[in-house]
Amino acid sequence: MTTKNKRLYQAIIVFCLLVFSGIVYYYFFCSFSAKDTRQYLYIDDDDNVDSVIYKIKPMATSHGMSGFLTLVRHSSYPETVRSGRYAIESGDGAFAVFRRIKNGMQEPLSLTIPCVRTMDKLAGYVGSKLMIDSAQIYHALSDETVCSKYGYDTLTIACMFIPNTYDMYWNISLDKFLDRMKKECSGFWTEDRLQKAADMGFDEVKTITLASIVDEETTNSAEKPMVAGMYYNRLKSGMPLQADPTIKFALKDFSLKRIYHNMLSVNSPFNTYRNTGLPPGPIRIPTIDGIDAVLNHVAHDYLYMCAKEDFSGTHNFAKTYDEHLKNAEKYSRALNARGIK
């Protein structure tokens, strides 16, 4: 072979290698995503390779999808599909995406426990954020056996959910989710908080139950220790709490703007007009501010309170019933003036 032919042959080889490298780069390393923003692929436990392909196809460019399918065909992935929540970055190539999904390299999400009133609402929210079905969550929270495993019953299980933000994997199992919530709850109850509760004659459940009422009475964090102190005074003196939010909870009508006398006779253990002491469990998941307001309540002599007539969300406090009636009349007139029924 002449020198000229050798050079031509080498040039052809180099050209072919460049073309091959370009093809490999184009299909496996150029951007897989069809969007410029991060996308998430959610793979359920019952997904197979076909359903994964169906889910990921709308997210991909045509060349990226071709590269992905090639990798799928020449791997064990069809037999090893892993559930999870997988991030697809705008600059990722098909190889990076495939490797992440095949190896189960999912990205955790941040789940914030909401301050909801009922466990069906909690189940619905958590179910919308995690792979766990909301009906499965609600069934567990309504099961005395499950609740007792964590030291609660179906009326107090809300106490286990501290409204913080937690990082966890989307495909966490129900058991592991509940275990995590119990662990976080135990961590929340520091020695300082437990001691303050004990000094009041309270435990975790009683503290959270009162905090739930305080939170329903006011959203003003600065006023919560005052409200907590007022209810604590009533508990110590043996007076019924007479907390209107417990009537809403007993009636399961949270749209009520006013509580009328005929509503106060509702037959429910949560009716704090008919029953003395705390209700048998919280009427919502309270805020951390609400919990700490109970533990750090203001010591005062007030036994009554009524929403202020200026609708500021704060209250007029009173030491005597006569004084309270005057405050209540001012608030009633303000409600009537606004046509609130």
What are these regions (language model features)?
Residues 124, 130-135, 139, 146-341:
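Bacterial extracytoplasmic/cell-wall-associated proteins, especially those involved in peptidoglycan
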Residues 1-38:
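N-terminal type II signal-anchor transmembrane helix
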Residues 25-26, 30-189:
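Signal peptide-directed extracytoplasmic domains
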